[in-house]
């Protein structure tokens, strides 16, 4: 009876060690991202608003054309991140 108890305790210890080591290995393979895609998109939008403003002496149509081109280009290059 004592031998069986020791064997069960040893088996449980081995399983516990195996479970603890596999959890550590699984977490090591998945580093946490430093920024999310939403944060990157927000930063890009803020940057384009800063640089996308109308310049002095520029007509409203030219400004609108530049903003539209910027928006379309941004959509084209960020489309793959959303699919």
Swiss-Prot record:
- InterPro entries given for it? Phytosulfokine
Q: Signal peptide: which range, if any? A: 1-28
**GO BP terms in the entry:** cell differentiation; cell population proliferation
**UniProt subcellular location:** Secreted
Where is it mainly found? secreted
- This protein's superkingdom? Eukaryota
Q: Which residues carry this modification: Sulfotyrosine?
A: 75, 77
Record PTM: Sulfation is important for activity and for the binding to a putative membrane receptor. PSK-alpha is produced by endopeptidase digestion. PSK-beta is produced from PSK-alpha by exopeptidase digestion.
Keywords from the named record: Developmental protein, Differentiation, Growth factor, Secreted, Signal, Sulfation
What is one term from the GO cellular component aspect held by the record?
Answer: extracellular region
Q: Which molecular-function annotations from GO does this UniProt entry contain?
A: growth factor activity
**Positions of the propeptide segment:** 29-74, 80-83
Q: What is the official name of this protein in its record?
A: Phytosulfokines 4
